[in-house]
């Protein structure tokens, strides 16, 4: 494992994890989205996603999904990298990158392209590419 790759992935996974955990907390604290500008996004979610009356009355379910799908897995990836668990870490990083890219594709479908989502797609792509590089390099 190259030190620069490990360090870069620790920084990237922690950055994504902290953002997702912060977003989940924000959605729990202000589930209407009024205080942080998310209310218009809730209307788009209701229009495009299934079961809007169940899952999109407010942002609480979305916050829990954000935490479970992006926040905690990214945090796990960072911890595995920090602890140097090299047998499993690249696989978790790869999964996190793919999951993040799929999440962003869903965001694009609901809200369209925007700079933040585009940037996070690149983050997911970087994670996946780095994990693949790491896995290929470790087989040599």
Regions found by a protein language model. Give the residues of each.
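Topology signature of small-to-medium multi-pass alpha-helical membrane proteins
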Residues: 2-140
């Amino acid at each position: 494992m190259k030190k620069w790759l490990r360090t870069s992935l620790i920084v990237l996974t922690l950055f994504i994890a902290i953002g997702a955990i912060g977003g989940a907390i924000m959605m729990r604290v202000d589930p209407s989205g009024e205080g942080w500008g998310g209310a218009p996004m809730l209307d788009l979610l209701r229009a495009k996603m299934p079961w809007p009356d169940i899952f999109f009355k407010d942002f609480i379910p979305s916050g829990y999904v954000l935490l479970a799908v992006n926040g905690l897995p990214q945090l796990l990836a960072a911890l595995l990298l920090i602890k140097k668990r090299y047998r499993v870490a690249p696989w978790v990083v790869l999964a996190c990158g793919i999951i993040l890219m799929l999440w962003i594709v869903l965001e694009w479908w609901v809200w369209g392209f925007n700079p933040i989502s585009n940037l996070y797609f690149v983050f997911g792509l970087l994670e996946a590419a780095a994990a693949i590089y790491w896995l290929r390099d470790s087989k040599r």
